[in-house]
């Protein structure tokens, strides 16, 4: 295996023995370390442990496959260098054993264990793992059967449970609660014991005991947090009051407020409940603020407007502090604890019944699974536990595995749950001196609590085990911190450190971000001179959605902005403590969210366009070993959730011309094609369903329009569409109602139902068919098909039926012709796959399949659209932060940072926590009233704290995905007020990290980000210098804050003003003043911006007449023309003979390319000595049809054209890793050079930069000759080489009156910063063999082109061009043209 230079911490993780916890930060090379540790033990001469004696546990099959591949590659490399026969034999043996090695997911390990020892748990060896959808359906069926049995028994306890948790309509909420409780219990090591202990949380006889319990400690913490937030607000009010001109007469009252709240915080920490109640009553009794004014400035210095503002702001801050106390009152003190105690005991009985029913359900569910010979995923772990432990002690199987496995290695240890932890303990040795458990993970990236992951398992070891110190030795239990990041640029790492030093504390994030946790730069980015690399600040883009008019794409008017910004957003301020059910159907809120997402999407799209289209900077390509321009595929947009905004973003990006792909877990069932096919399946199963029937009739399957549907409905206003369809098919045809007709039974059934009104119906049918015969045609075509499909559904499998429908209707092919056809077809294939998977279960039939899908959707579940985008496609990708974990991207946009955290789960009346148990309200069943309970509050508060800690870790994961640049986007209502608040929060914090209470009060990511950025020494918000800013860790990090007030026009602005301790954002009219200075100059913009003259009217009488005719023509419209026949004939004649007054402009391009100009100059050169009759070519100034690249199916079968071969050679030269090879090229043997170049070409083919045919057209010898030539020497020795440099110039051509935009791409620009000059190099693949004077040919053919290149370099880079070089690949020779020579060629065509 290659020997990279390991850091001391990495080397310790590779070498040391014992039970090790490796805390591997993002990008620290944990996988490489794990593989090297394993490889070392396999190949070490002293150890040489067989690879199949290791258990390597990963969390995904992809990760397991990657690890197996890495180990295999390491073994292959070792084999290549092995010399000793014994060593070769050992390595070959390990290579063979690798395929049976236990490198697997934990579920796969459990499965293997169960299949080996199935007989010990009385499981059929042919068992299968149930699909999650099948398991859901089986759980639902089992629970419904169980409820029927309970209802039959009519037990009072169960009836009380239904009354408490059900509704007046049904018992679905109770069913959902039991299913949730069961799922949660199965994540515990002993589910039955955990359920049995739940009622203990409600068994209290004294308040003191309750307050000293875990639940009471959480209540204390909740009170302290709210009081802490109140004190911060009071501190802000106090600071405002003591400012010059402020309301100093408020100060005594504010001091008293702070004193009372400080005492309440002290009592919440250590007082009795009585002490807390007394202190709260005192703290909540806010006296009124004194009236009048006490001046702290002479009258001549007082600004009345500023004084009024300070008074209002101070009062507002104090009012917000009052609200924090009000929140405590509405939760902790809503019902006195003395009154709650008796109710708590009753709730304990209710919880006991709930636990009993859940256990009963668990037993019945197990029976149902055994009957079907299947298990679910939680069974795999619990059956494995049964095999490994008995009476909480290891079994013989466990001891056998402990003896067999030399070491157990666990990846992503921070994401395991207690059951998985117990399994790992049982298969590894735990005793001192023999411990062999190696755990790798990063608790800062633990973001899967919703999958029952418990980061506390990692945290406990991290806190208890000693930490490795460089130079230290092994210990029985040891933590090794890997904090060197080999992924990201230093600018990214420093910014992350600066932020998380301030916001990630043990109280808020469950781990403190300190020197051990902070990232250290470890990646080396190869430099190629002074390139426009991605080195730069982290950009933070903020906007107020109420201040931007989306319809106009710009800022709102001052009145609108003031009115709307000051009004609270819909639903804003709704706290989770209020325990209100979320109003998911709030249309106004949904519309507001969509509008905000649309604004943000446009801002993000504009930033991406600037980056990609203007080639703002280049990124480092690891495979290439060099820099290249940013592509769309390099960019990823991360969001917390895509469910509600992905479609909005995709729409806006498509409008902006940015290719985009969003992989979501929603929206599948809402697509037209899936909805249409499901509607068809529904009417095949039951044709009496009117809504799906109407959907099918309106779909392309039948093709009726609304009018035709209305006519059908008019036949039977009280009937259904199926009956009208049958009557229309019959249409009075006696033959179709005879007994021998194939649809006799269907027709007779409907006719019999309407026998009395049949004559009238027949008249109606005939009338409709006479006036609309197309209805009859459509019905006659569709009805027989429908009957045939219904018969087929009874005798064929569901999957076969579905595929037959696709083929019989042609619908699968049809949707492929629509926009996004490939996506639509993929969605329909997913539906077919789902049907196949459904039939692999114990369930069968169309009806049950449709019922399964209905239940699936009724539970709020959905599927994402089928993926049709490959990894290498050049598109911007939208993914969730969870999906991005473990990945890295060159450019990362993190959007939606202003969206409120989702607290819906905390609104449930049944809250679950692994340590605190079940939290339910106090339920008065008789009066159907619910009150908050102290237990429910404690559970809710702990869940909220843990959820916030996870949100903090999610932010960390998102930020650490970026390799080169980070861009953060978020919205903030009342942005100016928010910035003021952030400043106050920052001023009130003297420490590096913000107080835990403040951090736990966050509602959005910006609540963390804003105060931290306010403290930056660069004064990002233009607030004035901030005290102690430079003392913060990593305060030298680079950030840029951009405040947007519009999304069209000149673009974003960054603007703020300082006013002592407060900030007031400029009004909307002044925000645009600095736009010009914020914009980045676009190459060529100066030359192309608005300088083209518009030809005015001449005084020529004919042109004047033509202009008048044009005006007359524009005036002639169908609405205004009122001419008699003669005048009409004259007008028609005049219009038909009208000629455009500026014919010379028709054949002139407004934009052209360097290649086209070169072609034109060659045409004039060729035709200067030719007679008109001898030239068959047309004038080059005429617009010609564009030429397109040949389709891939032609390219793959035809020989490449010379132009295509030239393009391939240019691409190969463009991507040569010059910087990587510069120092070693001269020392390498010729065969090594050729091998490197061949690998370079193969790499371009693998990365799909070149096709296989193009790669074959590139000669290794040509590339080697270039690098070994004089031109190659120039490339090696240049201070800076820029390749494929695009430009746009505005030029005046001698052959054209109007200016023209000229675009081109320069092959290479060699810059000398020391001499302040440049060379232009162009690579030519022309076949010049046998040409007598190639220099003359090349000079005549390409002189103008090089002249344009030189002009572009001098104008845009502000560097004089000394000379231009043509390198001819066919001759392996360079030709140098001095600047004066190309200037002459340029001036022959261009007016310089």
UniProtKB/Swiss-Prot annotation:
One of its GO terms (biological process) is double-strand break repair via homologous recombination. One of its GO terms (cellular component) is DNA helicase complex. It holds the Pfam family UvrD-helicase. The lineage of its organism: Bacteria, Bacillati, Bacillota, Clostridia, Eubacteriales. It comes from the Bacteria. Signal peptide: none annotated. Residues 3-489 form the UvrD-like helicase ATP-binding domain. Residues 305-319, 567-583, 1088-1113 have a biased composition (Basic and acidic residues). Its EC number is 3.1.-.-, 5.6.2.4. Residues 556-886 form the UvrD-like helicase C-terminal domain. Its cofactor is Mg(2+). Belongs to the helicase family. AddA subfamily. This is ATP-dependent helicase/nuclease subunit A. The heterodimer acts as both an ATP-dependent DNA helicase and an ATP-dependent, dual-direction single-stranded exonuclease. Recognizes the chi site generating a DNA molecule suitable for the initiation of homologous recombination. The AddA nuclease domain is required for chi fragment generation; this subunit has the helicase and 3' -> 5' nuclease activities. Keywords: ATP-binding, DNA damage, DNA repair, DNA-binding, Exonuclease, Helicase, Hydrolase, Isomerase, Nuclease, Nucleotide-binding. Residues 291-319, 555-594, 1051-1126 are annotated as: Disordered. Heterodimer of AddA and AddB/RexB. PROSITE patterns: UVRD_HELICASE_ATP_BIND (PS51198), UVRD_HELICASE_CTER (PS51217). Residues 584-594 have a biased composition (Acidic residues). It catalyses: Couples ATP hydrolysis with the unwinding of duplex DNA by translocating in the 3'-5' direction; ATP + H2O = ADP + phosphate + H(+). ATP binds at residues 24-31. One of its GO terms (molecular function) is 3'-5' exonuclease activity.
């Amino acid at each position: 295996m290659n020997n990279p230079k390991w850091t001391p911490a990495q080397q310790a993780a590779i070498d040391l023995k014992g039970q090790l916890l490796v805390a591997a930060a993002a990008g620290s090379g944990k996988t490489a370390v794990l593989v090297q540790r394993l490889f070392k033990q396999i190949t070490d001469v002293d150890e040489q442990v067989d690879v199949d004696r290791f258990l390597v546990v990963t969390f995904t099959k992809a990760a397991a496959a990657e690890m197996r591949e890495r180990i295999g590659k390491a073994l292959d490399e070792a084999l290549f260098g092995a010399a000793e026969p014994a060593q070769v034999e050992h390595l070959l043996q390990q290579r063979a054993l690798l395929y049976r090695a236990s490198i697997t997911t934990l579920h796969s390990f459990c499965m293997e264990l169960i299949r080996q020892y199935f007989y010990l748990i009385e499981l059929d060896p042919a068992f299968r793992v149930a699909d999650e959808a099948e398991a859901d359906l089986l759980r639902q069926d089992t629970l419904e059967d169980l409820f029927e049995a309970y209802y039959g028994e009519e037990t009072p306890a169960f009836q009380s449970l239904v009354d408490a948790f059900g509704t007046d309509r049904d018992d679905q909420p109770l069913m959902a609660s039991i299913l949730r409780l069961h799922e949660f219990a199965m994540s515990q090591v002993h589910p039955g014991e955990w359920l049995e202990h739940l009622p203990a949380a409600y068994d209290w006889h004294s308040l003191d005991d309750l307050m000293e319990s875990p639940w009471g400690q959480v209540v204390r913490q909740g009170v302290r947090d709210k009081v802490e937030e109140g004190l911060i607000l009071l501190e802000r009010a106090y600071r405002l009051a003591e400012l010059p001109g402020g309301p100093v007469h408020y100060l005594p009252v504010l001091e008293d407020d702070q004193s009372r709240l400080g005492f309440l915080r002290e009592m919440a920490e250590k007082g009795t409940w009585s002490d807390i109640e007394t202190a709260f009553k005192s703290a909540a009794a806010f006296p009124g603020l004194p009236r009048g004014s006490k001046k702290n400035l002479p009258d001549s210095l007082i600004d009345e407007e500023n004084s009024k503002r300070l008074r209002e702001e101070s009062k507002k801050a104090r009012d917000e502090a009052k609200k924090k106390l009000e929140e405590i009152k509405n939760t902790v003190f809503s019902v006195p604890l003395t009154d709650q105690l008796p109710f708590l005991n009753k709730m304990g009985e209710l919880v006991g019944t709930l636990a009993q029913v859940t256990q009963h359900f668990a037993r019945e569910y197990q029976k149902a699974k055994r009957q079907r010979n299947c298990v679910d995923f939680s069974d795999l772990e619990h059956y494995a536990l049964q095999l490994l432990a008995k009476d909480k002690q290891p079994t013989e199987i466990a001891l056998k595995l402990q003896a067999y496995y030399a070491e157990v290695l666990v990846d992503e240890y921070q994401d395991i749950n207690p059951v998985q932890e117990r399994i790992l303990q049982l298969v590894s040795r735990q005793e001192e001196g023999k411990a062999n458990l190696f755990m790798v993970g990063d608790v800062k990236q633990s973001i899967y609590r919703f999958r029952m992951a418990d980061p506390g398992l990692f945290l406990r070891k991290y806190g208890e085990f000693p930490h490795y110190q460089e130079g230290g030795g092994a210990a029985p239990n040891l933590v090794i911190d890997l904090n060197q990041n080999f992924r990201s640029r230093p600018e990214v790492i420093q910014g992350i450190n600066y932020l998380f030093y301030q916001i990630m504390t043990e109280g808020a994030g469950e781990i403190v971000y300190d020197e051990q946790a902070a990232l250290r730069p470890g990646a080396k980015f190869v430099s190629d001179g002074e390139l426009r690399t991605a080195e730069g600040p982290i950009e933070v883009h903020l906007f107020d959605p109420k201040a931007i008019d989306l319809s106009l794409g710009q800022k709102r008017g001052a009145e609108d902005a003031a009115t709307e910004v000051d009004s609270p957003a819909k639903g804003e301020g709704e706290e989770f403590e209020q325990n209100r059910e979320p109003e998911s159907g709030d249309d106004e809120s949904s519309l507001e969210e969509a509008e905000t997402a649309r604004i943000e999407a446009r801002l993000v799209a504009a930033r991406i366009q600037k980056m990609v289209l203007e080639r703002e900077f280049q990124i480092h390509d690891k495979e290439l070993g060099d820099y290249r321009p940013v592509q769309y595929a390099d960019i990823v947009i991360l969001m917390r959730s895509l469910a509600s905004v992905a479609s909005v973003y995709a729409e806006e990006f498509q409008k902006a011309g940015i290719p985009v792909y969003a992989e979501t877990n929603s929206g599948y069932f809402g697509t037209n094609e899936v909805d249409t096919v499901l509607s068809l399946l529904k009417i095949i199963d039951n044709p009496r369903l009117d809504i799906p029937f109407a959907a099918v009739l309106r779909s392309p399957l039948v093709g009726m329009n609304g009018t035709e549907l209305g006519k059908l409905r008019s036949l039977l206003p009280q009937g259904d569409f199926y009956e009208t369809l049958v009557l229309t098919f019959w249409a009075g045809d006696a033959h179709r109602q005879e007994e021998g007709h194939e649809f006799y039974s269907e027709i007779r059934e409907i006719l019999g139902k309407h026998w009395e009104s049949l004559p009238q119906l027949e008249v109606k049918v005939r009338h409709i068919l006479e006036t609309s015969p197309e209805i009859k045609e459509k019905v006659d075509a569709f009805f027989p098909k429908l009957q045939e499909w219904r018969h087929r559904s009874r005798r064929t499998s569901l999957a076969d039926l579905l595929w037959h429908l696709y083929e019989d209707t042609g619908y699968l092919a049809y949707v492929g012709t629509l926009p996004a056809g490939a996506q639509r077809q993929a969605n329909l294939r997913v539906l077919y796959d789902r049907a196949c998977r459904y039939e692999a279960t114990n369930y069968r039939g169309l009806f049950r399949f449709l019922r399964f899908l209905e239940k699936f959707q009724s539970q709020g579940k959905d599927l994402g659209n089928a993926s049709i985008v490959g990894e290498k496609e050049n598109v911007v990708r939208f993914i969730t932060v969870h999906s991005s974990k473990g990945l890295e991207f060159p450019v990362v946009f993190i959007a939606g940072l202003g969206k409120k955290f989702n607290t819906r789960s905390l609104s449930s009346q049944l809250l679950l926590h692994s340590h605190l148990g079940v939290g339910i309200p106090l339920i008065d069943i008789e009066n159907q009233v619910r009150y908050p309970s102290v237990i429910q509050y404690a559970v809710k508060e702990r869940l909220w704290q843990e959820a916030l800690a996870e949100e903090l870790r999610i932010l960390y994961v998102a930020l650490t995905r970026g390799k080169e640049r980070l861009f953060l986007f978020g919205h903030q209502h009342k942005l100016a007020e928010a910035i003021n608040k952030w400043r106050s929060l920052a001023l009130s914090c003297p420490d590096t990290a913000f107080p835990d209470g403040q951090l736990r009060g966050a509602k959005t990511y910006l609540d963390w980000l804003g105060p931290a950025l306010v403290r930056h020494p660069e004064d990002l918000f233009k607030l004035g210098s901030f005290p102690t800013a430079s003392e913060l860790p990593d305060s030298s990090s680079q950030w840029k804050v951009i405040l947007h007030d519009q999304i069209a026009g000149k673009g974003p602005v960054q603007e703020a003003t300082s006013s002592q301790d407060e900030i007031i954002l400029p009004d909307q009219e002044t925000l645009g003043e600095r736009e010009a200075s914020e914009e980045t100059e676009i190459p060529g913009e100066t030359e192309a911006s608005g300088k083209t003259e518009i030809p005015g009217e001449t005084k020529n009488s004919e042109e004047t007449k033509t202009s008048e005719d044009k005006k007359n023509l524009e005036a002639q419209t169908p609405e205004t023309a009122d001419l008699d026949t003669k005048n009409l004939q004259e007008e028609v004649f005049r219009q038909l003979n009208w000629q455009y007054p500026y014919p010379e402009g028709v054949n002139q391009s407004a934009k052209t390319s360097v290649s086209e100009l070169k072609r034109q100059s060659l045409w004039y050169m060729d035709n200067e000595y030719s007679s008109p009759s001898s030239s068959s070519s047309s004038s080059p100034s005429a617009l010609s049809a564009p030429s397109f690249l040949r389709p891939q199916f032609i390219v793959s079968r035809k020989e490449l054209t010379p132009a295509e071969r030239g393009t391939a050679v240019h691409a190969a030269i463009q991507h040569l890793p010059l910087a990587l090879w510069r120092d070693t090229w001269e020392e390498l043997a010729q065969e090594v050079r050729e091998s490197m170049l061949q690998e370079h070409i193969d790499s371009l083919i693998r990365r799909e930069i070149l096709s296989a045919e193009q790669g074959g057209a590139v000669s290794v010898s040509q590339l080697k000759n270039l690098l070994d030539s004089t031109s190659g020497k120039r490339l090696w020795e240049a201070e800076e080489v820029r390749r494929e440099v695009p430009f746009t110039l505005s030029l005046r051509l001698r052959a054209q009156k109007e200016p023209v935009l000229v675009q081109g791409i320069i092959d290479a620009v060699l810059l000398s910063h020391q001499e302040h000059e440049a060379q232009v190099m162009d690579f030519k693949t022309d076949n010049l063999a046998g040409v007598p004077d190639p220099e003359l040919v090349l000079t005549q053919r390409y002189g103008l082109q090089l002249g344009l290149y030189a002009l572009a370099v001098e104008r845009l880079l502000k560097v004089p061009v000394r000379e231009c070089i043509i390198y001819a690949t066919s001759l392996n020779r360079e030709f140098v043209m001095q600047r004066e020579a190309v200037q002459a060629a340029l001036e022959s065509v261009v007016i310089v």
